């Protein structure tokens, strides 16, 4: 009962989760948003490209103008209020790029280890401090950290969870494009 009461406090903590649809942390974030009834969306590469082929159609995401993962990452960081990176240090590959993009777009970012549940109160405080309504969630793909999807799912469920009777129905994102910055001009 104690954990159910605790999770109810987090109801409405963020209005929307965005992510890029890659295996691992990205899909964990989208799955948790769907499960908890939190609005979700984000950008995926053109053609819905991902390491396992294509991003499943169940995730309603906008396709970036290119198939480049870096362009998708930049758009998701740009369109968020802040980025939560769920990863063990040191950051590598696309996860390191996400941190660079957060710095470039001057968006708050926070790196958390998904196995350290004690960080949840700190993350809640950080979300409130920065008045985060649209949260970009990023981290390693499954092939880089085999258990990262499961760990991220558990972490995000504890962070954003709510009692079943307070569960909202997620608004499915529309396919309508928001403004797309000329991603070809972005320098990484």
Annotate each PLM feature.
Residues 2, 6:
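A short, basic/flexible loop-to-alpha-helix module at the beginning of a structural domain
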Residues 185-188:
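Non-Sec secretion/translocation targeting segments of pathogen effectors
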Residues 164-168:
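Low-complexity, Pro/Thr/Ser/Gly/Ala-rich linker/spacer regions in secreted
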Residues 10-134, 141-144, 148-163:
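Acidic/glycine-enriched connector segments
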